[in-house]
């Protein structure tokens, strides 16, 4: 879905920065509950047009409890405590990722599992992932006026059941290019069948907890059952709550299940032609939740359906990825992208994200010259700076302040604002390294800065993970001039490596970067992506000049240590998520335990069917 500028089923086989970065923020207004579901009317799978002959794998057959009328594995064995939590999203790192959504669904679930919860993540199978096994379970799902067959693939890693929905609309489009073409053939261009693709995801996700017999977890056996919390993520999963209320709960299925809806980026909403609503196969009572009118002419002019709007209204709880972003979303049309009034009614809770501290660890990083921790950072970062200067082809001198920019080259991240500020910095004794890929116009823009200032600026416009790690270790300041930033990961990675950030004062950057302690704030930049505001250029340049003057001083060294002495892991955010989800009151839910995550390279992660 291009960013905004301002079932039926048949189954067969305001200060800048806050001290407590992990504390959630709830913004509740009038307690609006959305549309009320119909009262459950008893029934079973047959009234859903569901017939079952799901075939278990040989390993599953050895451990299945027989005797269930509906499914051979319907009995849930739980020797652990906690909740049954099912995350659903279009991305799941490291298997698929274009941004923060993939990182969250890759990192938060293992932290939840470490606390004793049974956790599943469901996402499309965009590639032939070598560690995902065919469960031999298939489902025929109705989309529009036809049935489409999907298969369920599975792997169990880091305490989490990873489930992949296999269908040609996912695999054929993206195969081999997972990071580039999940949503469309080119940046900003959508596949025409995205509604069908993600309707399949939503409906298949509702079947998975009931029919997949998963026995890898030493504490849980069998299916997840029906007492689950679904955590939907962004517009691609907007209809899931409606399908739950339309297809299951009136038939006595998932009576106690609840849905939390998490907004990762309000700019992508899933807006489609109003005439497409019947293709969702939902009753008329849900039409108003999707109904939307805006002033844009894409995909059609005037009246539309809006998947994110429906996800917000039909969910039992609405969340987003940082407290300050939650405040911005309800502040007005510009930052709420015309859904601000809806969120003021439903209320919204902000929980800041964590990061993968095992992948980004300067004490063990194989890509950097000198490994270090908070006690050795100052000298080690100087050595890494020299290595970075040599790698980039810049004059090697550890005394020259080095500013870095790493990010997707699109309007949100402000590469055009950064480029416009570079000439204002050239009178300073400074070096600048730019790394990113994205829209061609921005790639050309950054390369033009290198051509104009060859002795001071280097631009690398291709994916280069080793260089990204070396930049984090060698840069003195990380520039993050985002027009808006729901949470942001880049600043967490920078601070993990002891690199203070000079950032715009928006979203999660406000919650995670503290002025004068772990970084420098530029103030809020304009969200108008069509122009580069001169006032924004001045803010970026002035803040970077201020940061340059601090580099090399005792105050700067204290900032480096402050950055590295933080706990930026998922541990705190996972506990906050637990508290919110427990509040939904799903039957059998209980608080978790204090546990440690399974390491990525642990023997428990060996793939097995």
Swiss-Prot record:
The keyword ATP-binding does not apply. It is found in: Plastid, Chloroplast; Plastid, Amyloplast. Residues 1-77 form a transit peptide. ADP-alpha-D-glucose binds at residue 97. Transmembrane segments: none annotated. GO terms for cellular component: amyloplast; chloroplast. This is Granule-bound starch synthase 1, chloroplastic/amyloplastic. HAMAP family: Glycogen_synth. Pathway: Glycan biosynthesis; starch biosynthesis.
């Amino acid at each position: 879905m291009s960013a905004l500028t301002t079932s039926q089923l048949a189954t067969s086989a305001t200060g800048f920065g806050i001290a407590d970065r992990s504390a959630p923020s709830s913004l509740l207004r009038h307690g609006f509950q959305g549309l009320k579901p119909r009262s459950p009317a008893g029934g079973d799978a047959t009234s859903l047009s569901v017939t079952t002959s799901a075939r278990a794998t040989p390993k599953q057959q050895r451990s299945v409890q027989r005797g269930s009328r509906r499914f051979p594995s319907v009995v849930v064995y739980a020797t652990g405590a906690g909740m049954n939590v099912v995350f659903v999203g279009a991305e799941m790192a490291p298997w698929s990722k274009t941004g923060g959504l993939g990182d969250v669904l890759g990192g938060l679930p293992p932290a939840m599992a470490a606390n004793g919860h049974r956790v599943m993540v469901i996402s499309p199978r965009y590639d032939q992932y070598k560690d995902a096994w065919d469960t031999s379970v298939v489902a025929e799902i109705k989309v529009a006026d036809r049935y489409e067959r999907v298969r369920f693939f599975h792997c169990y890693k880091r305490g989490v059941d990873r489930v992949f929905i296999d269908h040609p609309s996912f695999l054929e489009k993206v195969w081999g290019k997972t990071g580039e073409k999940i949503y469309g053939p080119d940046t900003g261009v959508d596949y025409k069948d995205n509604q069908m693709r993600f309707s399949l995801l939503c409906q298949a996700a509702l079947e998975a907890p009931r029919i997949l017999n998963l026995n890898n977890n030493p504490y849980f056996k069998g299916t997840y059952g029906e007492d689950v919390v679904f955590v939907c993520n962004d517009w691609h999963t907007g209809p899931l709550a409606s399908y739950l209320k339309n297809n299951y709960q009136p038939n006595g299925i998932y009576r106690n299940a609840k849905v939390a809806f998490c907004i990762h980026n309000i700019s992508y909403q899933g807006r489609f032609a109003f005439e497409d609503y019947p293709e969702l196969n939902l009753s008329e009572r849900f039409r108003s939740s999707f109904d939307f009118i805006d002033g844009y002419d894409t995909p059609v002019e005037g009246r539309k359906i809006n998947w994110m709007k429906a996800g917000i209204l039909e969910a039992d709880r609405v969340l987003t990825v940082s407290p300050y972003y939650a405040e911005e979303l309800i502040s007005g049309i510009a930052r709420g992208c015309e859904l601000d009034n809806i969120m003021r009614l439903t209320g919204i809770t902000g929980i800041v994200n964590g990061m993968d501290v095992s992948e980004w660890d300067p004490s063990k990083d194989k890509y950097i010259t000198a490994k270090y921790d908070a006690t050795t950072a100052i000298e080690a970062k100087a050595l890494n700076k020299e290595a970075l200067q040599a790698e980039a082809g810049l004059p090697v001198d550890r005394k020259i302040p080095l500013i870095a920019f790493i990010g997707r080259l699109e309007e949100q991240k402000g590469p055009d604002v950064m480029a416009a500020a570079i000439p204002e910095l050239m009178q300073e004794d400074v070096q600048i390294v730019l790394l990113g890929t994205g829209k061609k116009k921005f790639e050309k823009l950054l390369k033009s800065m290198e051509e104009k200032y060859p002795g001071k600026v280097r631009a690398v416009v291709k994916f280069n993970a080793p260089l990204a790690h070396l930049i984090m270790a060698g840069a003195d300041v990380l520039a993050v001039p985002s027009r808006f930033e729901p949470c942001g990961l880049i600043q967490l990675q920078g601070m993990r490596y002891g690199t203070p950030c000079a950032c715009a004062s928006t979203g999660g950057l406000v919650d995670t970067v503290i002025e004068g302690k772990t970084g420098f704030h530029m103030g809020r930049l304009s969200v108008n992506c069509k122009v580069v505001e001169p006032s924004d250029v001045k803010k970026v340049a002035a803040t970077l000049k201020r940061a340059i003057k601090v580099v090399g001083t005792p105050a700067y060294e204290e900032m480096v240590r402050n950055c590295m002495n933080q706990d930026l892991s998922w541990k705190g955010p996972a506990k906050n998520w637990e508290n919110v989800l427990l509040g939904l009151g799903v039957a059998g839910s209980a608080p978790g335990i204090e546990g440690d995550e399974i390491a990525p390279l642990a023997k428990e992660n060996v793939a097995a069917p």
